[in-house]
Amino acid sequence: MIINHNMSAMFAQRTLGNTNLSVQKNMEKLSSGLRINRAGDDASGLAVSEKMRSQIRGLNQASTNAQNGISFIQVAESYLQETTDVIQRIRELSVQSANGIYSAEDRMYIQVEVSQLVAEIDRIASHAQFNGMNMLTGRFARETGENTVTASMWFHIGANMDQRTRAYIGTMTAAALGVRDVGDESILNIDDPEKANRAIGTLDEAIKKINKQRADLGAYQNRLEYTVIGVNVAAENLQAAESRIRDVDMAKEMVDYTKNQILVQSGTAMLAQANQATQSVLSLLR
């Protein structure tokens, strides 16, 4: 029997230390709900998980971006509806003025209302804003000529670079719609039947332009609504995949934790027994 090196105690101590470390890791995983709390737990799994998390957060923000884009389009469309109502009223007055039964004085009164309605078109265009940005004054108009300033509204609808789309909104001022002269600022004149007759054609073109813009906005909105559905599904599926990598199986981890607790208790008892064994040497010295 030797006393300088108690191999049984050394083995029990080493095993107990390893088991205590396992219990510590079990407690970390059970308290956090994560299988991977640091790179040392699973280096490759952590790298894959972080990439997935980046995509998930990007997709969630892309969904928000698309919903904000829908709100932007709905606001623009509501202002265009107001403009349409005004144009329709001007057209109605033009049809009325084109009838020969009205006197010059009658048409003068009609012209006064037309003048106010034309001013209202410009007011709508100047007040149509979203987050401080004018929507109907050409800021987001598609390029129509070599010297025309081009802009658009970009919607970033993906998690990665260049995953975006753009929307155009034409200029909807009175001049752009043809009811105010660009040069001398004169408004649509319906003070005689012939002018009123020509005005009807001008107003039909204005209505056609607005309808085309509203149809485009409707198409943009439909696309963004499908985008929201698509990115939400992608984020959900990616979240499930990331969970399988990162999250801990609580039942399995609890079984492992219970096993290690038992090993700690038995290891502690065996270490005490191994240390006690060397005490018997003293009986030989009596």
Curated annotation (Swiss-Prot):
Matches recorded under InterPro entries: Flagellin, Flagellin_C, Flagellin_C_sub2, Flagellin_N
UniProt protein name: Flagellar filament 33 kDa core protein
MF (Gene Ontology): structural molecule activity
A GO cellular component annotation in the UniProt record: periplasmic flagellum
Keyword Metal-binding on entry: no
Family: Belongs to the bacterial flagellin family.
Entries under Pfam families matching the protein: Flagellin_C, Flagellin_N
Protein role: Component of the core of the flagella.
Principal localisation: periplasm
Keyword terms of this UniProt record: Bacterial flagellum, Periplasm
Gene3D superfamilies tied to this protein: f41 fragment of flagellin, N-terminal domain (1.20.1330.10), Flagellar export chaperone, C-terminal domain (6.10.10.10)
Known partners and oligomeric status: The flagellum consists of an outer layer composed of repeating units of FlaA around a core that contains several antigenically related polypeptides.
Protein location: Periplasmic flagellum; Periplasm
The keyword Ligase is annotated on this UniProt entry: no
Superkingdom: Bacteria
SUPFAM superfamilies: Phase 1 flagellin (SSF64518)
